Amino acid sequence: MHILTDYASDIKGMISYFDRIIVKGYNRQLCNSKQFGYFLGAQKILYKDYPTYAQEKTEELCKHIENIAAEQNRPSMFLRSSKVSKEETALKLLNESPVDSGLVCLISTVELCTAMGLEKNHKNGQLYVGSQNRKCKFYYLYFIDEEFGWMHFKIQTWFPFMVQIYINGREYLSKMLDKEHIGYTRYDNTFTHIDDIKRAQELTVKIESEKLSRIFDAMARKINCHCELIRNILGHEYYWCLSECEYATDIMFTTRQSLEAIYPSLVEHAFFSFSCEDIMSFFGRKVSGKGSQSFQGDIASDLRKRHKGIRIKHRMKSNQVKMYDKVSVLRIETTINDPHDFKIWKDTITKDGYHKKAWTPMGKSIANMYRYAQVSLAINMRYLNHLSVIYDKVTPIKMIERMSSTIETDNRKYSGFNILKEETIRLFEILSNGSFIIKGFTNMDIRKRLYTHEDITSAKVRNRTTRLIRKLIAHELVWKTPKSMRYHITVKGRKVIGHILYFIKKEYPEAFAFIQ
């Protein structure tokens, strides 16, 4: 069974592409103490004069960047605290001073950095320039770019002038769709509808890392006025690497209700059923025999309720895959922070000096962006396929037949559930509430939601609810937590209730309207 085929009538389609992309740029020569010394020597700058020289270059850079904003008549703002959201500040400035494209605003603040500073060798008393952890001024330039849409360019104002570029993959994809004249509907950074999904997915296959490098180089030259000087002396500019990369697979449902009918079951299954071995298999780790015992690292699952829905995340070391719902979209998203856990087929040099192709640990170079996409998509699809194991349409029918009939447990008879009765449907909707997945529910939780027009503190209502819970336990829909007054829905209960609610919502929406 597979979600995409079993619920095809409720699904518009699926699209996979990058979500958040953070690219860092740095000059490797400027980060090396000896080569930095060569850089200064080529300009006849003595080590003792470096602080003055560095201050001059910083002032030149700051003046140049501020002139860019002034020439384009765009707003600038200095944030006294680096903890203030630059994104929200930029959006506020955009709202106050609208622009369709180009530079939106310039934001500056003081943050921690790694800069090149003057140091003294205590053994021989000689001066040299080495990397230091300190604070310096950073500039954030926000753009509405023709190629990438909403993005920002961050630059450090002290040597070695490291930069960071943030791109929203969904913004990037929307620009591709605009060029192809493909219609779409977006909510935030999520596509809820795309007119031509097949063509849209074709656009995402070709990843031109060389083109991206050229675009980033052009941006850097425009913003960093020292690029030409650095290139003339050292022969290199910025080296671009992927600091953080999110790749998301979005399954677009026709309605929010269609997604809600199955999502609680998906979350519960993922949280309670996925083992460490399962999570390792998502990330492409072969688990057999003593395979899991040789793994060095930590694996964890985390469930969190957000204002937009429920998010579940599985982490292996620093890489992670998560699932969450957003409007009518089910998103499975992989974040690669450490690519060395994955392999890439590339040219290598043997000990004998020969060149040959081999699978080697993947690095962070932007040239490997295509491989990031391949690995992330494979993880997303393994996760989706594993979720599909719970969807069996035959077994729930037999379960529903049994729960609709009278049963006898411990010499006591319990009547069946009338699945079309209003009170039963209300009860099932309450039980399917995602907030009960972790902590479970109590007698009072059911009373407050089920008997809204009655005195829930009365013994009559309390006893009636107790009998109802016992009935749920007898039908194996609920289990009681030992030594507590809390209850949890069983996997069987989640499966049966999910199918009943899905059927009623889909086939008899007017009959279901009373609990909306």
Question: What is each of the regions a protein language model found here?
Answer:
Residues E401-G440:
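Short alpha-helical segments that sit at the start of domains
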Residues M1-Q257:
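Long, contiguous, compositionally biased segments that the model treats as domain-scale units
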Residues L141-I397:
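Extended, non-transmembrane interaction/recognition domains
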Residues Y451, R470, A474, G498:
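Residue-level detection of the helix-turn-helix DNA-binding "recognition helix"
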Residues M485, V491-Q516:
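Short, amphipathic alpha-helical interaction segments positioned at domain boundaries
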Residues I456-A474:
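Short amphipathic alpha-helical interaction segments
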Residues I437-T452, I456:
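Short acidic, hydrophobic short linear motifs in intrinsically disordered regions
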